[in-house]
């Protein structure tokens, strides 16, 4: 007995969907991480540095898996300023960035007033570290690293963190 054409097509479609599931999950993780970063910015208390009329610069590498998802927030407001994702290589100083998104292996720049450093993966020196695990994205907060850059976090953000250092 041979399978019907419908059953053959159904099995082929199911197999294709299952093969694509890990890629979809990866894409979803990247979008979630970008949304986390946008919300981190919303729940950060920034020092008054006279930048009220300037764009809210989010610096990252275009090679980062997060790049296009971070760009999807361009134009959205953060404390009355428009989010603008830019290539870190085009900034003369990392301190020009309101948020600096680093890959796990990227070198940490010197502290800069008003700059929130978020690292995607384990590492030291960032104020917020995104952590993958147990099918969830979690984050750790280093309040000392934030304080070095003149930043404070909302208690709401701190309550959601996996660890607060």
Named regions from a protein language model:
Residues 2-8, 22-165:
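Short hydrophobic alpha-helices and adjacent helix-cap/hinge residues
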Residues 9-19:
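Bacterial N-terminal signal peptides
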């Amino acid at each position: 007995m041979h399978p019907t054409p419908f059953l053959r097509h159904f099995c082929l479609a199911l197999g294709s969907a299952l093969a694509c599931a890990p890629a979809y999950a990866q894409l979803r993780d990247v979008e979630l991480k970008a949304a986390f970063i946008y919300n981190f910015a919303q729940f950060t208390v920034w020092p008054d540095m006279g930048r009220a009329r300037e764009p809210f610069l989010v610096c990252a590498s275009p090679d980062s898996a997060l790049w296009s998802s971070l760009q999807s927030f361009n134009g959205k407001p953060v404390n009355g300023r428009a989010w603008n994702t830019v290539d870190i290589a085009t900034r003369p100083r990392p301190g020009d960035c309101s948020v600096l998104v680093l890959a796990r292996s990227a070198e940490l720049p010197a502290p800069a007033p008003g700059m929130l450093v978020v690292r995607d993966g384990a590492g030291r020196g960032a104020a917020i570290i995104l952590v993958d695990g147990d099918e969830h994205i979690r984050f750790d907060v280093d309040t000392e690293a934030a304080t070095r850059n003149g930043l404070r976090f909302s208690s709401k953000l701190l309550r959601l963190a996996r660890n607060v250092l």
